Curated annotation (Swiss-Prot):
This is UvrABC system protein B. It is found in: Cytoplasm. Residues 26-414 form the Helicase ATP-binding domain. Keywords: ATP-binding, Cytoplasm, DNA damage, DNA excision, DNA repair, Excision nuclease, Nucleotide-binding, SOS response. Gene3D superfamilies: P-loop containing nucleotide triphosphate hydrolases, UVR domain. It comes from Aliivibrio fischeri (strain ATCC 700601 / ES114). Its main location: cytoplasm. SUPFAM superfamilies: C-terminal UvrC-binding domain of UvrB, P-loop containing nucleoside triphosphate hydrolases. One of its GO terms (biological process) is nucleotide-excision repair. Forms a heterotetramer with UvrA during the search for lesions. Interacts with UvrC in an incision complex. ATP binds at G39, V40, T41, G42, S43, G44, K45, T46. The UvrABC repair system catalyzes the recognition and processing of DNA lesions. A damage recognition complex composed of 2 UvrA and 2 UvrB subunits scans DNA for abnormalities. Upon binding of the UvrA(2)B(2) complex to a putative damaged site, the DNA wraps around one UvrB monomer. DNA wrap is dependent on ATP binding by UvrB and probably causes local melting of the DNA helix, facilitating insertion of UvrB beta-hairpin between the DNA strands. Then UvrB probes one DNA strand for the presence of a lesion.
Amino acid sequence: MSSAYELVSNYQPAGDQPQAIKTLNEGLENGLAHQTLLGVTGSGKTFTLANVIAHSGRPTIIMAHNKTLAAQLYGEMKAFFPNNAVEYFVSYFDYYQPEAYVPTTDTFIEKDSSVNEHIEQMRLSATKALLERKDAIIIASVSAIYGLGDPKAYLSMILHLRRGDIINQRDMLRRLAELQYKRNDMAFERGTFRVRGEVLDIFPAESEHEAIRIEMFDDEVERISKFDPLTGSIITKDMPRCTIYPKTHYVTPREQVLDAIEKIKVDLAIRQKELLENNKLVEEQRITQRTQFDIEMMNELGFCSGIENYSRYLSGRPEGEAPPTLFDYLPQDGLLIIDESHITVSQIGAMYKGDRSRKENLVEYGFRLPSALDNRPLRFEEFEALAPQTIYVSATPGKYEIEKSDGEIAEQVVRPTGLLDPVIEVRPVATQVDDLLSEIRIRTKNNERVLVTTLTKRMAEDLTEYLDEHGVKVRYLHSDIDTVERVEIIRDLRLGEFDVLVGINLLREGLDMPEVSLVAILDADKEGFLRSERSLIQTIGRAARNLEGKAILYADKITGSMEKAIGETERRREKQQLHNETLGIVPQALKKDVADILELGDMTKNKRKVVAPKIKLSEVAEEGASYSAMSPQQLEKAIQKLESKMYQHAKDLEFEQAAQVRDEIDNLRKQFIVNS
């Protein structure tokens, strides 16, 4: 079967990978709606999925439960498919304060947000890839279930230009303005155009390093070319055609806006009557004033602040209908993969209710029309109805995934490296701290690392202090630490800056540390969320990448969760040992460069034809890395300053210096995603 994908890898499927790939491919070909890949830590689940995607040849959305994991997957998939469209679709807000009203204190909180332009460009690039290509892999967060512009309206606004077309230049500029592009003859940046005589330059909103040049001869399109907006060098000369996509997903034709205004007026009159009948005079005055102001803005400018609350009218949807989302851009033969499904599935289910309760207050107290309730994420049942063929991926699949898969579970227990699951020991609670200290000393002599998980913040702090007093190099990882500092701490642990990391609920999914040979779980017999079967298996799995991996559970009794977790780990270990003995495999230690923890994939790879001098990325926790400790807001300001500097160099014809600054900006943008 020929595929649109080209999988690039030095490895061949090994261990349980070939069987898992075969099972999943057969399931897809047989039309199974739901399948589950049960893959243990370090078994190469991403490589298995890459093989399944390559074999299927279908456009794919991979959903992750947070931006950090999404960025990690983006980097891995980008490495496997360097010649295909691997895109990144997460929330583009650096900061977002939603509109809200607190009745008890009569406090109205205005919407406040800060949009990251680079991520907005990547989102536009993602939807463009889905609309244009079969070989599109979109790495998305739960942002994918939130309302996006209607794909029909979006497609209807696209500007197609062909060589030889007869079109008046002013008409072309008017069309660009409708797509929300702005004219800027001085600073040529994303989402703008400039005019020089009969030459029109357009910087597409979804592009990072390529702009379009339209050369006219009177009213005829004489030549279309693609060029580097920084240096001006031609990338592709004399193209037969080009397509200009809108600057935003939320663009709407003028006729639809005018039609929406009439519908808003009708609903406003109905709402005014309801409020007056219930003697809510303040609320009636409030909704009248706010809505009429919005109508005036839409009439004059085509949009208003908070226009998303009128999305139902703009897209022509009936009341209560699901909003258009990223899934509406996915072709019918698309594929959905949900990573760490035991968390992501429940996260998808939780989004709707939290959003609904906040909006109900706004509607009840006259800040918004009832139509605002339809600007929402998908309900879980709507998500289920929209989702194409789905593969759930987890080391500990939840009840939902197992039921949906109806026994269609591909097991990936045997690792290609031959590494075994950790040995598990249960020891008494009474001497847990002293026993732990002696175990730590054994590990530090062998230059190995230790993870310790406690039940409470207080205990984690006390234990950290106690170990520190006894000469142990220890750090404490807690929920107040932001993403970038967390990555920095993990990197320092791997480098040996300290030997023991103490935490509560942060030592589970997505931590890849081959140096960790011991995981200690204190108070393992206290049943609850942090000591459930799934949590225990995930935590024990942190020691599964080391040859000497061991997990010690401190408990006075064996709980049901402990029994199941120990039983499952031993079952996997036996299967792994049998496989190694049968094939004569000697377990190999996993070697992974410490720098790899921060790799997000080269976001500009294969997008740029112009070769420029390389500038080293300022990696998080790197000595002297001035940008690594910055907040996303500070990084955004630094990027803006560098962009001004870059344009000044270009203006002064200092193209080498401009290219160097451009590369530094690219690196900062990668840093930005880590820090977000």
